[in-house]
Amino acid sequence: MPIVTVVPAPPPVNFHNRMAVRVAALMAVMATLLFFLPYLNWLAAGFFAALLYRRRTGYLLSLESGVRLGWITGVLMFVIVTILLTATVALVTASGGFSALPPEVRNALDPRFQEAMKTLQSGPAIAELLVMLFMFITLLSMAGGALGAKLSGRGQGPVV
């Protein structure tokens, strides 16, 4: 009689999967540190989250699972970016805004930056910015997760 080994089904990729959340959180922090590369860092976070998940667990990710892992990474990145944005706006507002800065400093700032900070002083503009950030961060991270799942090595193990 042949010996049959039963391989347990890999855990689904969601917020209940501790390894998936750990990998996503690590990539979210790393991508946030690369804030000077917008769009590319969000795409890369999803991509490397899928590769790191594959490496740590040994499970191949299906395209759907890669998108889910990218989405988890994107949501965590959005939370981090929102906290940083809120802290920045609160600090600037508490110190009297940009009008409290010395004229030399105000004139040295990029005019686009000055205009953006004036815009961020209205509630609807902040809400619009947050919605756009959520869309960009999560969609690019999901695309990166799908790409990472696709390129992480087909045919080498069970697909999650």
Where on the chain are the PLM-derived regions?
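Low-complexity, intrinsically disordered extramembrane tails and loops of integral membrane proteins
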Residues: 1-18, 154-160
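Hydrophobic alpha-helical transmembrane segments
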Residues: 21-25, 67, 71, 127-131
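Selective recognition of hydrophobic, aromatic-rich stretches within alpha-helical transmembrane segments
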Residues: 27-52, 81-96, 122-152, 156
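Membrane-interface interhelical loops and short interface/amphipathic helices
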Residues: 92-123
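Short hydrophobic alpha-helical membrane-embedded segments
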Residues: 14-28, 120-121
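Selective transmembrane-helix segments that form parts of the transport pathway or gating/packing helices
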Residues: 70-82
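Amphipathic, cytosolic membrane-interfacial segments at TM-TM junctions
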Residues: 54-72
